[in-house]
């Protein structure tokens, strides 16, 4: 009887061990660990549509890079807007045997724990979308960043807004020679929010648009928060608001929703500009509810991250021609307005059709 119990205990122990590995996200059940790339992806939040679309693209591109010799397992977790929780999720993925980490930081100034844990296990880290401070990224040669130049997005937003305003004098509804504007900012202290805000406004003024600031409001990149902020601003300023600049499309869409609900006729709406090129924003541009966005090329970024992950796993050198300082990959933003909106909507439709056809 004792032998039976011991045998049963061993079997149960083996089963529990297998379950722990499977649930932790990065484990390989095939037993062929030398041919399996385990990629751990950790985002700052599970509620950001752009980040969700980017990680979907990353999974899709990694899937295309599988072969008879190489299997790829992707595990995606969220830090739920808590840096400590994100650190713990990273530790779980490292313990589970991930070979490459892709990290979208909660706090871009606090990557220390993640870098320390990854370095101790010699696991490369590709940070994305939220750029760490340069001093942090340069402290180890297996740290990389994939994203865009926030300054460029601010400049482009200012350019398309200035072009529209200068060719549509009716934007200046009170005909005082100045454009009264509000600005929806991502979050306090976030480098992208700071750069997009600064360069969008500077570029408008550089292009002969006289501005009068009514209000700057933080809405944490969130559509619902932006709608609430805009409702208060509409109550305060009414039709005085002639321009809404938003650090991203989600907040711009919050502004759109506020104006839909308040019941103003379209000529009393301000012109609204966002950044990211989300599908909902593209539809709003087509409908005339927004006047433009800056397309943040998630497809290009996902392709680069997938390529980097496989190359690093294979122990090969990265393509230095595409990297700045050997560590940074920046994809180019693109302007979207009424003149080219169909091109981008068609691209979104083709992408969706392609995903629906995947086995």
Give short role names for the model-derived ranges.
Residues 22-25:
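C-terminal motif of bacterial Sec signal peptides marking the signal peptidase cleavage site
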Residues 27-29:
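Bacterial signal peptide processing site
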Residues 32, 86, 145-176, 226, ...:
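Hydrophobic alpha-helical segments within soluble ligand-binding/sensing domains
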Residues 35, 177-188, 192, 203, ...:
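Hinge/cleft segment of the Venus flytrap/periplasmic-binding protein
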Residues 40-61, 65, 75-88, 98, ...:
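Extracytoplasmic "Venus flytrap"
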Residues 50-65, 153-157, 191-210, 225, ...:
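Short, solvent-exposed amphipathic alpha-helices that sit
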Residues 58, 103-120, 125, 200, ...:
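Hydrophobic alpha-helical
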Residues 114-152, 177, 278-286:
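Flexible loop/hinge segments that line or gate small-molecule binding clefts
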């Amino acid at each position: 009887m004792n032998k039976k119990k011991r045998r049963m205990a061993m079997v149960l122990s083996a089963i529990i061990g297998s379950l722990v590995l499977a649930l932790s996200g990065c484990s390989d059940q095939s037993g062929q660990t030398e041919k399996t790339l385990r990629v751990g992806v950790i985002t700052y939040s599970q509620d950001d549509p752009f980040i969700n679309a980017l990680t979907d693209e990353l999974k899709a591109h990694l899937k295309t890079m599988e072969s008879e010799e190489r299997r790829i397992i992707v595990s995606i977790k969220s830090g739920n807007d808590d840096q400590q929780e994100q650190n713990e999720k990273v530790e779980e993925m490292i313990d589970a045997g991930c070979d490459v980490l892709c990290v979208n930081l909660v706090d871009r100034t606090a990557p220390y724990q993640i870098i320390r844990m990854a370095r101790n296990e010699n696991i490369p880290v590709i940070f994305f979308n939220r750029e760490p401070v340069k001093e942090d990224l340069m402290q180890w040669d297996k740290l990389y960043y994939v994203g865009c130049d926030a300054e460029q997005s601010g400049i482009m937003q200012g350019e398309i807004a200035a072009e529209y305003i200068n060719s549509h004098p009716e934007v200046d509804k009170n005909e005082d020679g100045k454009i009264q504007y509000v600005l929806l900012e991502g979050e306090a202290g976030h480098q992208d929010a700071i750069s997009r805000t600064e360069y969008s406004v500077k570029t408008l003024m550089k292009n002969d648009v006289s501005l009068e600031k009514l209000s700057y409001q933080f809405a944490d990149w969130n559509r619902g928060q932006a709608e609430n902020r805009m409702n208060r601003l509409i109550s305060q300023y009414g039709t005085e608001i002639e321009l809404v600049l938003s650090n991203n499309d989600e907040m711009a869409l919050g502004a759109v929703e506020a104006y839909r609900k308040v019941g103003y006729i379209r000529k009393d709406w301000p012109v609204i500009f966002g950044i990211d090129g989300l599908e909902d924003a593209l539809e709003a541009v087509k409908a005339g509810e927004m006047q433009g966005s800056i397309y943040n090329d998630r497809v290009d970024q996902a392709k680069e991250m997938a390529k980097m992950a496989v190359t690093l796993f294979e122990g090969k050198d990265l393509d230095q021609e595409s990297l700045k300082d050997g560590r940074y990959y920046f994809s180019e933003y693109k302007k979207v307005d009424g003149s080219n909106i169909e091109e981008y909507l068609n691209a979104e439709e083709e992408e969706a059709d392609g995903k629906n056809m995947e086995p």
